[in-house]
Amino acid sequence: DLKGILAFSTVSQLGMIMSMLGIGAVSYHYQGANSQLYVAGFVAAIFHLINHATFKGALFMITGGIDHSTGTRDVKKLGGLLTIMPISFTLTVITTLSMAGVPPFNGFLSKEKFLEAMINVTHLNLMSLNTLGILLPIIAIIGSIFTFVYSIKFILHIFFGSYKPEALPKQAHESSMLMLISPIILTSLVIVFGLFPSILTQSIIEPASEAVSQTSN
């Protein structure tokens, strides 16, 4: 089920966000609000939360359009929709590659911040992170690899391979513009936030993080 795949991937993405919040919280507890890792962890978490809302929201809408156009969300029945649904294919490629952490999309930037925070936390004398903490970046890298793999398979199973009209309840067709306008807007934000991340980080996220630090002090 396409929506099931996206739902399970949301669990992993939320795990990434909570990991960054956890790094920020631990750093704040041991080093205070002036810790660079505290600010970096919370900025990365909020940044990825917004990025995730853009690419995953678009993917769920695109999946709904595919379900409406073909009558099914079963991956085994889908395939070969590239020439039939070219606009949906383009939107899916952009948002899925963002989810996989491929540049120049916004998911790459927040995943880079996540991996950077995971590596930096091992250099701090926090609990036993200088020993057991070496596992954190390794687990993060493995998780990122799995995310990339299922993201690519998501594209391949839907749009490539052989088209099987006999397996579909309806004759496949491109989604209407009314159904495409919302994912187009979100996909545009994926590109804009990837190319111009300062729109979010410098104008919204970093001031909010600094305000929290001042309140805590």
What do these predicted regions represent?
Residues 1, 11, 52, 78, ...:
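Divalent metal-coordination and catalytic microenvironments
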Residues 173-217:
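Hard-cation-handling environments
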Residues 7-17, 67-106, 112-122, 129-143, ...:
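Interfacial and helix-entry/exit segments of alpha-helical transmembrane bundles
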Residues 56-60, 134-171:
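Predominantly late transmembrane helices and immediately cytosolic-facing juxtamembrane segments
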Residues 17, 56, 60-63, 72, ...:
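Alpha-helical transmembrane segments of polytopic integral membrane proteins
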Residues 24, 64, 103, 111, ...:
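Juxtamembrane/transmembrane-helix interface segments of polytopic membrane transporters
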Residues 31-36, 113-127, 200-217:
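Membrane-interfacial helical/loop segments at transmembrane boundaries in membrane proteins
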Residues 2-74:
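Alpha-helical multi-pass transmembrane bundles of energy-transducing inner-membrane proteins
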